[in-house]
Amino acid sequence: MAHHIPPLNFGMVADDLYRSGQPNELNFPFLEKLQLKKIIFLAPDDPSQQFQNFVEDQDIELIHLGMDTHQNPWNPISEEIVISALKIILNPDNYPLHIMCNLGRHRTGTVVGCLRKLQRWNLTSIFEEYRRFAGSKVKLLNEQFIELFDTDLVTYNNAPQWLYLS
């Protein structure tokens, strides 16, 4: 019997939209159950070969947005990458969809935080969610990025229904 162990920092963002850190082979049976169509990978480095093989075997489209060669990996994620990720997230044709980075903390948390701004969550709630996943590794620059993020930069037509429920 296969065990269904979620990846590090796994969470459900909305219906058929998930977040986590990069999974390992122990997490693959769990991910299979999600029947993912696409994965947004936000880490600057390549995903592990095991993970790439899993994605290929499951016929999941892997979208690697984290490769920003002009940026120090310790800096916050770029606005361009966040906007690209949000455009993918706001297209219901991409669901079920999973957002991830190496540990599911900072890059993923920043994208989800900006998504929450689009949903018109208040900043206190956005930061509470970010901090829940970041733990003791909170980066104030990421919180500042989320706070100052201009949601008008994100254009979408046919967004998921849950975007309008808040």
UniProtKB/Swiss-Prot annotation:
The organism's place on the tree of life at top rank: Eukaryota
Cross-referenced CDD domains: PFA-DSP_Oca1
Span of domain Tyrosine-protein phosphatase: 9-162
One term of GO molecular function: phosphatase activity
One Pfam short name: Y_phosphatase2
Similarity comment: Belongs to the protein-tyrosine phosphatase family.
PANTHER family in the cross-refs: TYROSINE-PROTEIN PHOSPHATASE, TYROSINE-PROTEIN PHOSPHATASE OCA1-RELATED
InterPro entries (alphabetical): PFA-DSPs, Prot-tyrosine_phosphatase-like, Siw14-like, TYR_PHOSPHATASE_DUAL_dom
Gene Ontology CC: one annotated term: cytoplasm
PROSITE patterns: TYR_PHOSPHATASE_DUAL
Active-site residue list: 101
Compartments, as annotated in UniProt: Cytoplasm
UniProt entry tagged with the keyword Lipid metabolism: no
Catalytic activity: O-phospho-L-tyrosyl-[protein] + H2O = L-tyrosyl-[protein] + phosphate
Enzyme Commission numbers on file: 3.1.3.48
Name assigned to this protein: Probable tyrosine-protein phosphatase DG1060
UniProt keyword Heme present: no
Keywords per UniProt: Cytoplasm, Hydrolase, Protein phosphatase
Main location: cytoplasm
